């Protein structure tokens, strides 16, 4: 009897062990859910749709090469529709209902600031792929776009140089929200440090979706009569289309009043006749026109993805800086997960520090413990075909300074996530 009972107990234990083992194996083979949080409608769709598309391309590339830790990635795409409170609602859903391991998303700083408390409360992980104003460092966000010292400051230094036209007066034009206002606060302080007076600086803001730039462009022409002038544009979204069209209509040439943009790239210019805009500038960390083997491969994969998925725009679709930053972010996250052996947010965070990736820009980008990438800086001139000629770039990558030295009170703030 004792022997029979012992055998029965052993069989039950073995079955239980097998059940647990099978459950663990099944769980290990379940796909890893990945959130994609971009506006696919509304004023920001012109810029953000391509970030969703390139994220899906990158996820597909990873899945075809075996996935991450032997598991496929499953994208969960949501559309916050350029509605800032809706971003927070969608982010909460991704974390609590869909149980995503990571989110790639947001463009505007107002959308990022809308979701930030959600990711910090629930200990989620967000990769943010767009240039921004700095003044932020969260353990729950990795910033793969540029900080002001990797875009705004070098661009204005270039405009002031002999090579860049020797500008003495600056018209700061932006969309009315935190990124343009904070960036221009930094730029005004920087210009003061270079001896530029307030009388030689003009600041103008328009709402999201603004479409009538006739009066503003007329005021730019009038302001430019006071001396060599440059326009610094932090306009975001589909308002860039009427602004650049009005520049062309008004005959405002780059040789007279150059415009440097921080949120306009190949995608935003795709639907515009750029011949009247030749010579105007954009500052980024990547341009589609650069040539190197990594970028050639990136563009080839993108063209194939567009064709195989019959994406709107077809062979006219382009690559741009935030797309590259999205691609780099996803690939770095994959490397960090594999290093950590887990998708656990705290483990992945630690594994992200020091991650390197050979980017389409031609540079090896490094993730620092301040959660920002070291990146190159490039300035490009608009061409007649909507692409950019790179006219200036840094020889090496530049470490991001999230806390600008031109903002009072930033002295002594830690340059790492605590």
Language-model-derived ranges and their functions:
Residues 3-11:
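N-terminal export leaders
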Residues 89, 133, 140-250, 291-293:
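Extracellular/periplasmic Venus flytrap/periplasmic-binding protein
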């Amino acid at each position: 009897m004792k022997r029979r009972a012992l055998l029965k107990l052993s069989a039950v234990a073995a079955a239980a062990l097998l059940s647990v083992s099978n459950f663990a194996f099944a769980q290990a083979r379940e796909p890893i859910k990945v959130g994609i949080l971009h506006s696919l409608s509304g004023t920001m769709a012109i810029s953000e749709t391509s970030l969703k598309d390139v994220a899906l391309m990158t996820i597909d590339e990873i899945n075809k090469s075996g996935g991450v830790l032997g598991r496929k990635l499953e994208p969960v795409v949501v559309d916050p529709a350029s509605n800032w409170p809706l971003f927070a609602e969608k982010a909460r859903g991704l974390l609590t209902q869909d149980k995503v391991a990571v989110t790639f998303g947001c463009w505007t700083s107002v959308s990022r600031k809308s979701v930030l408390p959600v990711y910090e409360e629930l200990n989620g992980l967000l990769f943010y792929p767009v240039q921004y104003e700095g003044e932020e460092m969260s353990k729950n966000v990795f910033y793969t776009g540029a900080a002001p010292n990797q875009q705004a400051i070098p661009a204005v230094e270039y405009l002031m140089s002999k090579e860049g036209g020797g500008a003495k007066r600056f018209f700061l034009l932006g969309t009315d929200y935190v990124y343009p206002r904070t960036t221009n606060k930094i730029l005004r302080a920087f210009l003061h440090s270079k001896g530029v007076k307030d009388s030689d600086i003009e600041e103008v803001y328009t709402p999201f979706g603004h479409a009538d730039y006739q009066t503003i462009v007329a005021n730019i022409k009038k302001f430019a009569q006071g001396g060599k002038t440059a326009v610094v544009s932090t306009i975001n979204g589909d308002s860039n289309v009427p602004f650049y069209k009005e520049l062309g209509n008004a005959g405002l040439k780059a040789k007279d009043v150059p415009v440097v943009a921080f949120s306009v790239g190949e995608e935003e210019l795709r639907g515009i006749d750029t011949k009247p805009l030749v010579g105007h500038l954009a500052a980024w960390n990547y341009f589609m026109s650069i040539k190197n083997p990594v970028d050639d491969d990136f563009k080839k994969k993108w063209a194939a993805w567009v064709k195989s998925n019959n994406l709107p725009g077809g062979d006219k679709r382009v690559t741009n800086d935030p797309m590259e930053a999205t691609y780099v972010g996803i690939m770095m996250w994959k490397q960090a997960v594999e290093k950590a052996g887990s998708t656990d947010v705290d483990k992945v965070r630690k594994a992200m520090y020091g991650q390197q990736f050979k980017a389409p820009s031609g540079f090896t980008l490094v993730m620092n413990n301040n959660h920002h990438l070291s990146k190159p800086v490039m300035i490009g001139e608009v061409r007649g075909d909507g692409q950019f000629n790179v006219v200036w770039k840094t020889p090496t990558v530049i470490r991001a300074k999230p806390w600008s030295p031109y903002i009072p009170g930033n002295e002594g703030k830690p340059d790492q996530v605590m």
